Amino acid sequence: MAPLTPQLLLQRGRPKTDKLGKIQSLNLSGLQLLSEHLDPNLLGRLKKLRELDLSNNLLETLPANLGLSHLRILRCTNNQLGDVTALHQFPELEELNLEGNPFLTVSDNLKVSFLLPKLRKVNGKDTASTCSQVENLDRELMDRVTAHWQKFIATVSPEEETDKVRADFMRSAVRDVCYGPESLIEFTQWRVRMIAEELVASGGAQVQDAKVPVEHPQAAGASKFRAREVASKRPGKDPVTLPPSKRVRALPPAQAEGSPMGADGGQAALHLEPLHFLQCHSRNNSPKDLETQLWACAFEPAREEGHSRATSQTVATCGGEAVCVIDCQTGLVLHKYKVPGEEFFSVAWTALTVVTQAGHKKRWNMLAAAGLRGMVRLLHVRAGFCCSVIRAHKKAIATLCFSPSHETHLFTASYDKRIILWDIGVPNQDYKFQASQLLTLNCGSVPLRLCPVATCPDDFLLAGCEGGCYCWDVRLDQPQKQRVCEVNFIFSEDSKVSGQRVDGLAFVNEDVVASKGSGQGTIYLWSWSQTWAGRGRQSVLPVVILVRLQWSPTNLAYFSLSTCPGKNLVLCGDEEGSVWIYDVEHLLKEPPQATTLQPPTQILKWPQPTALGQPVTKTMINTVVANAAFTYLTALTDSNIVSIWRRC
């Protein structure tokens, strides 16, 4: 492609004119333009240009000083942009579209909101929520950099050279001032460097935050398959908050009667405090929505093995027509993906190794989300777009999970009473996936929970179903591509009990499985190896129960349990808004009599946050998940509230 010419600009510009200075709208899309083709001397003659379309080109960056100071609308979709800082040259910009630039991340979205104070829309979406996030994040970073400066300058000797002091402070600030999620570290380090430079230039005077837009209002943020009767809520006007007395101090750990606690051989309490209550799945962004049921959440895997911040504090949540990705420390909603008319039931993470067009290997954390429509949506969260949609089932998908041993292998379980194993592959040059179907597992009832066997995930898959707990052979070296279950696990010799729903299923460690149903008031801990060793040729197999844990006797279903394997913890919510926590390490070392119900180590009571000016006095906790280090715990309710707790 030859460089741009005045004739080409006149041909593609509007209104039609013979003078470059009169063009107000210019379409340069689809011309295979490279960054060096954007000549500032030529484009700078477009003195009245208000709208520019650079979509579907090969731009890696935008040249500085293009001279388009009056530009209001800029479209740069489907390019190769890797940096957005050059956009600051367009101070009047109101609308920006950067979709289809795979190297841009959530950090770049925040940079854009910071650099362009008049921006109203990015990628077709209102920027109010992002601007509010930038405000809060920037305010905290300013406070931390200022505190770091004061601490640093107190240790400096008067004899030290000024230039060396400044350089040392800059390095230490970028290295030591940390806040927010790892996914935003590029933005936070960028802002820390800017704030530090301003501090040094001002001799330590308080940095002003006039650059941050402060007047944008913050955006507020029932399935036929799973709907339960909605718990009572009370309307009002304000966002979800805790009463002041519960926000300023750690909530004392609630202890179930008879819990093993204290120094007399019992277990010490796990101290957790309520940190954030978020209403980010609202339909139509309505703050009055206390009805949307939230179903599943999963913590993002660490971005880099051996990284100093190896434990993720980023959690994906789903419910209603939205999937949200939230930073637990700050409570910021980093990304929100909405599909009108969808009901999301499940999310799952995987980490893929992707080769870029330049031949570089990158590690991508991909999020799969699925629900009512039977489609799996693969989201590249850091870049903020949906890569592909897999039309997996004709009926709703109840749950999904990735294989722990094959990063591209995905199990989907549907209300069509089938489980399908997919190989999603890796994205091509257009960042699209080509999924292939590997296995179909037939179920006698609807599968609700999936759990690859910890010691042999390539061989066997467990599933909790409406009709019980089942196991399938999933070895890919076997010829059959359609398979029936190998074993039906039962928890009692009573056939009535054996056919009951299993809606909670997870491995506590490599051998011990936790499972539960409704109406039993019990969570079972049972041994996979001991149970499987007694199989023989049986198709119905009693499990070897190690421990029975006391839980709510409710007849309501779909309260999912989870585990924190490295900590030997089992977690489950209930119909009263409580979180039941079981530290089972001592129980597994010295199992009690199997018939004895063991009480929870701790119960976190619902703290009754305020929504719309009135307390939410009652809710149900559908799902509870903690990160690997058990520093954060996320509980999802049936009243459109994501509650985040922090271990203290």
Swiss-Prot record:
InterPro entries cross-referenced by the UniProt entry: Leu-rich_rpt, Leu-rich_rpt_typical-subtyp, LRR_dom_sf, LRR_LRWD1_dom, LRWD1, WD40/YVTN_repeat-like_dom_sf, WD40_repeat_CS, WD40_repeat_dom_sf
Bias-annotated ranges (Basic and acidic residues): 226-237
Chief location: nucleus
A Pfam family per the record: WD_LRWD1
UniProt GO MF annotations: chromatin binding; histone H3K27me3 reader activity; methyl-CpG binding
LRR repeat residue intervals: 22-43, 48-69, 70-91, 92-113
Protein modification: Ubiquitinated; undergoes 'Lys-48'-linked polyubiquitination leading to proteasomal degradation. Ubiquitination occurs within the WD repeats at the end of the G1 phase. Ubiquitination may be catalyzed by the CUL4-DDB1 E3 ubiquitin-protein ligase complex and other E3 ligases.
Single GO BP term: establishment of protein localization to chromatin
Tissue expression as described in the entry: Testis-specific.
WD repeats: 392-432, 443-482, 497-536, 541-592, 616-648
Domain of life, source organism: Eukaryota
Transmembrane segments: none
Residues recorded with modification Phosphoserine: 259
Region (Disordered): 214-262
Keywords: Centromere, Chromatin regulator, Chromosome, Cytoplasm, Cytoskeleton, DNA replication, Kinetochore, Leucine-rich repeat, Nucleus, Phosphoprotein, Repeat, Telomere, Ubl conjugation, WD repeat
GO CC list: centrosome; chromosome, telomeric region; cytoplasm; kinetochore; nuclear origin of replication recognition complex; nucleolus; nucleoplasm; nucleus
Domain remark in the UniProt entry: The entire WD repeat region is required for the interaction with ORC, CDT1 and GMNN, as well as for association with chromatin and for binding to histone H3 and H4 trimethylation marks H3K9me3 and H4K20me3. Centrosomal localization requires additional conformation.
PANTHER family: LEUCINE-RICH REPEAT AND WD REPEAT-CONTAINING PROTEIN 1, OPTICIN
Subunit structure and binding partners: Integral component of the ORC complex. Directly interacts with CDT1, GMNN and ORC2. Interacts with ORC2 only when non-ubiquitinated; this interaction prevents LRWD1 ubiquitination and degradation. Some of these interactions are regulated in a cell-cycle dependent manner. Interaction with ORC1 occurs predominantly during G1. Association with phosphorylated ORC1 during mitosis is not efficient. Interaction with CDT1 occurs during G1 phase, as well as during mitosis with phosphorylated CDT1. Interaction with GMNN occurs from G1/S to mitosis.
Summary of the function given for this chain in its UniProt record: Required for G1/S transition. Recruits and stabilizes the origin recognition complex (ORC) onto chromatin during G1 to establish pre-replication complex (preRC) and to heterochromatic sites in post-replicated cells. Binds a combination of DNA and histone methylation repressive marks on heterochromatin. Binds histone H3 and H4 trimethylation marks H3K9me3, H3K27me3 and H4K20me3 in a cooperative manner with DNA methylation. Required for silencing of major satellite repeats. May be important ORC2, ORC3 and ORC4 stability.
Name of the protein this chain belongs to: Leucine-rich repeat and WD repeat-containing protein 1
Originating species: Mus musculus
